[in-house]
């Protein structure tokens, strides 16, 4: 056995020593009987590592590279593809021949036709040309300069720009390019082209000469046999120009021709001319032709009726510059001789012309102000031209709306309005005749309006029109998805719970099982209105149903003075009855009843909102005299759920007690106005339809039960913001005094609250409820100094201040004012002085009450009381100044006794209870003392208790002799 080392790995080789060796060289090494791979062990140990490695590839640079290993699923997919391809190649299913005798089997009787090619005999397939990308070469040295010059010239040619070439000596040459066929000809600016006469017309610098040689064109490119005006400065190749003057240069710059022996010879602009040639040369500048036409036309057409002798005052060069600016401002073009520019200008309207020229005109005006201050007239011309160009009607949409509104109205004044509207649409391109015609039509419109205004001032209502709007009022609160359920019904949410304050106080329940007979007639102060609630029971017969759906007409007469409202002489249309197109009053018809709904709007635009329902399934109808509660119910729809509690409490506790039954429309509008201050969202709340009964002076707020009585006028007010106009004192209207509901007896509420206050003075539980829920009841204590002092002495006012200090500072401030007032009253002993102190403080407390905005019932009572006291004081002040005595002052003692009646009874009961408790305590304590003390001390203790008893009972005696009938606990015989 032989052991050899391969690297660091030992390998054992077994040798057979008995094997015979041959004579050749092939037997020189020992023959291994059993071959063993020396790397097997190494491969086995490195197998896992090699498995994680990729394939070993041979790179082009002679190195081995290990590739990224492939995932197993890719190796499996490649293996499947190789096997599939190998199977396909080894498959024997190969088509060797085609049997032409076989007839194909027809599976369908339908003729499938045959394939026809559109190729002709001249068809030749076009092979796709390979796209060869040109390699960009890096420009270096002189190539860069040539490339930049070439690109620069290309830009100048395409954009029709002026090329300026300057050498080191700052000698500049100018050139332009003009198109001749497919090539561009270079025109160098010569002296004679700018009105300068020189022997040498141009001197080129070195760079300009090289550019001119590069841009020179042959004479044949001009497509003409002779040169003509406009060819001055053109650079031509000398070898292609006939009859050119002696010149050694390869280029010729056209200046003009000189006759030499009756032969015209072309003169190069760089050649120096003699005096004779200067006088005879015919140059090819187009400016001569321009100035020839300009001068002749100017002289022939200049005005002759001038009031002065013209002189040459302005600089001629500046005149030319200003003329060029005016020309470009009036007619933007590249060349004044270009027909394409003329055509483009004619195809533009005024708006397009203004957009194209406005920026340049502004620049020209600024340039004239800075560099040409003497040419003020040119600036005025441009401003006038600019104003003329920008004349356009910016409100064409409104004109189209006018046309739509008057399309079906051929009579005056709408026919005149149509003509005026047509003229306004054409503003910017009007003739004088059209403007004059529009003025005549406007005169007719003014005459019509003047006659109509005069008729209104004469109370002539023949021209009065107050149509119902054809557009439905959009209530965003009824369109918001968050306010609707899946059936698009309004979701009341918390509003449904708080709406019970309305339903429980101002609505009657209707049990459908008992019928509707007792709810058919709604009582009025001086009549009745028949509701359609009984028609909820419908017959199935069509004829009977149609007969049942007829209303009972009531004659309310035509449009009259009581149907309209005026404010500062003009009609206030929302507060008027509605009319049709011809001025006839719109009258109500039969209104269908519905169940469980709140109806907003009227006629065909009514919206039905499902009312909040309960488990009983009963319906609700407003009580007689309280139909105006439906207005506040409609306003509740626009109140947010968070504020619905405050809204319903304010309506129940403050608004409805003021209104009561059958208030006037002015009071209802005032109440709505107050609510909109605290709840601004209700301004856009939609109202139920309001009908006007002129015979009875009543306004009916329709509910969901409809109306059989028909023929009423219809009020136009549709939303709360329109209804509150009835609350204005400036409104001249009989409608605002019509009854809708109301109770003018405000004093009853004050008396009830006052009795409740007197009852609670010495009852801590009631007084605590007043302080926490209705603190403004304490303000009513100002009616009596005794009541006010009782609250002050019992520390009730102090408790009210402490309770509201961290809840509502304004309420706490009012309670503080009451406490200060009570302390001032306690300092006075005379009743009249106490009343004067109280009355003097009423305006201050009333001003503070106006700053409180809380949904409390007692606010109204306190405000009414304070306003009465303040106004009464102002009235009495005038009487006192005149030397008279008010009867109210003499009756104050009687009023004080009247208020102290219940208050004094409570105090008497308290004294009796106190006496009984005191006597029991004294007797219990004395019985113990008498057992322990001697007779002398007993007598002394007896006298002290007797004196204390007299003081507590209010006696003025400081020492009283004990007797048996004195009432003293000890004035009795000792046992």
UniProtKB/Swiss-Prot annotation:
It is an enzyme of class 3 (hydrolase). Potyviral RNA is expressed as two polyproteins which undergo post-translational proteolytic processing. Genome polyprotein is processed by NIa-pro, P1 and HC-pro proteinases resulting in the production of at least ten individual proteins. P3N-PIPO is cleaved by P1 and HC-pro proteinases resulting in the production of three individual proteins. The P1 proteinase and the HC-pro cleave only their respective C-termini autocatalytically. The record marks 284-285, 741-742 as: Cleavage. A motif (Involved in interaction with stylet and aphid transmission) lies at residues 335-338. PROSITE patterns: HC_PRO_CPD, PV_P1_PRO. A motif (Involved in virions binding and aphid transmission) lies at residues 593-595. The active site is at residues 192, 201, 232, 627, 700. GO terms for biological process: proteolysis; symbiont-mediated suppression of host innate immune response; transport of virus in host, cell to cell; viral translational frameshifting. Belongs to the potyviridae P3N-PIPO polyprotein family. This is P3N-PIPO polyprotein. It comes from Bean yellow mosaic virus.
């Amino acid at each position: 056995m032989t052991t050899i080392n391969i690297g660091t790995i030992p390998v054992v080789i077994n040798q057979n020593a008995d094997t015979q060796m041959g004579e050749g060289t092939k037997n020189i090494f020992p023959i291994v009987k059993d071959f063993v791979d020396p790397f097997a062990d190494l491969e086995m140990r490195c197998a896992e590592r090699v498995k994680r490695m990729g394939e070993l590839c041979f790179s082009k640079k002679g190195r081995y590279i290990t590739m990224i290993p492939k995932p197993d699923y890719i190796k499996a997919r490649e293996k499947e593809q190789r096997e599939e391809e190998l199977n396909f190649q080894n498959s024997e299913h190969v088509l060797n021949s085609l049997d032409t005798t076989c007839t194909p089997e027809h599976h369908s009787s339908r003729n499938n036709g045959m394939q026809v090619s559109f190729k002709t005999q001249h068809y030749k397939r076009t092979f796709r040309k390979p796209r060869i990308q040109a390699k960009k070469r890096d420009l270096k040295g002189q190539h860069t300069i040539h490339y930049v010059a070439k690109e620069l010239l290309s830009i100048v040619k395409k954009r029709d720009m002026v090329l300026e070439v300057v050498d080191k000596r700052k000698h500049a040459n100018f050139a332009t390019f003009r198109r001749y066929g497919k090539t561009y000809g270079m025109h160098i600016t010569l002296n004679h082209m700018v009105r300068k006469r020189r022997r040498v017309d141009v001197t080129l610098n070195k760079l300009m000469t090289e550019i001119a040689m590069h841009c020179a064109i042959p004479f044949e490119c001009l497509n003409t046999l002779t040169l003509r005006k406009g060819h001055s400065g053109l650079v031509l190749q000398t070898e292609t120009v006939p009859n050119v003057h002696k010149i050694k240069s390869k280029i010729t710059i056209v200046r003009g021709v000189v006759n030499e022996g009756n032969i015209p010879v072309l003169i190069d602009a760089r050649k120096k001319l003699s005096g004779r040639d200067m006088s005879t040369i015919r140059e090819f500048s187009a400016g001569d032709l321009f100035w020839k036409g300009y001068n002749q036309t100017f002289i022939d057409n200049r005005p002759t009726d001038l009031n002065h002798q013209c002189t040459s005052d302005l600089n001629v060069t500046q005149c030319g510059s200003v003329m060029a600016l005016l020309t470009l401002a009036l007619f933007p073009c590249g060349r004044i001789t270009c027909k394409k520019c003329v055509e483009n200008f004619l195809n533009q309207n005024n708006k397009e012309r203004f957009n194209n020229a406005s920026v340049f005109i502004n620049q020209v005006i600024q340039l004239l102000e800075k560099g040409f201050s003497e040419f003020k007239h040119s600036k005025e011309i441009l401003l006038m031209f600019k104003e003329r160009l920008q004349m356009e009607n910016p409100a064409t949409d409104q004109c189209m709306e006018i046309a739509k509104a008057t399309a079906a109205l051929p009579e005056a004044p709408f026919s005149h309005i149509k003509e005026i509207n047509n003229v306004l649409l054409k503003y910017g391109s009007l003739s004088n005749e059209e403007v004059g015609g529009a003025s005549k039509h406007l005169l007719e419109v003014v005459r019509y309006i003047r006659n109509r205004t005069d008729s209104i001032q004469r109370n002539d209502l023949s021209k009065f029109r107050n149509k119902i709007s054809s557009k439905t009022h959009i209530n965003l609160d009824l369109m918001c998805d968050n306010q609707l359920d899946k059936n698009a019904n309004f979701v009341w949410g918390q509003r449904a719970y708080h709406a019970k304050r309305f339903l429980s106080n101002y609505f009657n329940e209707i049990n459908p099982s008992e019928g509707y007979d007792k709810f058919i007639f709604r009582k009025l102060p001086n009549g009745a209105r028949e509701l359609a609630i009984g028609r909820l029971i419908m017959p199935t017969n069509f004829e009977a149903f149609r007969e049942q759906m007829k209303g009972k007409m009531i004659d309310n007469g035509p449009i009259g003075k009581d149907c309209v409202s005026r404010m500062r002489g003009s009609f206030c249309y929302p507060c008027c009855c509605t009319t049709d197109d011809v001025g006839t009053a719109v009258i109500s018809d039969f209104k269908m009843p519905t169940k469980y709904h709140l109806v907003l709007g009227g006629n065909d635009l009514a919206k039905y909102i499902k009312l909040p329902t309960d488990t009983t399934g009963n319906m609700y109808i407003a009580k007689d005299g309280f139909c105006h509660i439906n207005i506040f119910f409609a306003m509740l729809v626009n109140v947010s759920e968070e504020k619905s509690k405050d809204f319903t409490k304010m309506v129940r506790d403050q608004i409805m007690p003021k209104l009561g039954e059958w208030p006037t429309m002015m009071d209802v509008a005032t109440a709505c106005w107050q609510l909109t201050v605290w709840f601004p969202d209700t301004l856009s709340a939609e109202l139920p339809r309001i009908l006007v009964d002129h015979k009875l002076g009543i306004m009916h707020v329709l509910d969901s039960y409809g109306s059989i009585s028909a023929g009423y006028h219809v009020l136009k007010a549709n939303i709360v913001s329109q209804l509150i106009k009835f609350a204005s004192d400036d409104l001249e209207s009989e409608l605002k005094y019509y009854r809708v509901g109301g109770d003018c007896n405000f004093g009853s509420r004050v008396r009830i609250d006052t009795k409740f206050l007197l009852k609670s003075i010495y009852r801590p539980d009631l007084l605590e409820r007043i302080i926490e829920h209705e603190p403004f009841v304490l303000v009513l204590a100002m009616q009596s100094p005794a009541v006010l002092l009782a609250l002050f002495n019992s520390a009730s006012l102090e408790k009210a201040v402490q309770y509201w200090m961290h809840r509502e500072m304004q309420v706490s401030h009012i309670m503080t004012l009451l406490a200060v007032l009570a302390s001032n009253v306690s300092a006075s002993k005379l009743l009249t002085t106490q009343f004067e102190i109280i009355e003097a403080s009423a305006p201050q407390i009333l001003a503070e009450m106006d700053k409180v905005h809380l949904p409390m019932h007692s606010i109204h009572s306190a405000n009414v009381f304070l306003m009465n006291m303040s106004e009464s004081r102002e009235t009495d002040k005038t009487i006192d100044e005149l030397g008279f005595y008010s009867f109210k002052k003499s009756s104050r003692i009687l009023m004080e006794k009247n208020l102290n009646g219940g208050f004094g009874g409570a105090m008497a009961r308290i004294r009796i209870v106190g006496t009984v408790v005191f006597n029991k305590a004294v007797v219990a304590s004395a019985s113990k003392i008498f057992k322990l003390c001697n007779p002398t001390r007993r007598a002394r203790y007896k006298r002290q208790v007797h004196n204390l008893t007299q003081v507590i009972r209010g006696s003025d005696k400081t020492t009283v002799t004990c007797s048996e009938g004195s009432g003293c606990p000890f004035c009795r015989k000792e046992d």
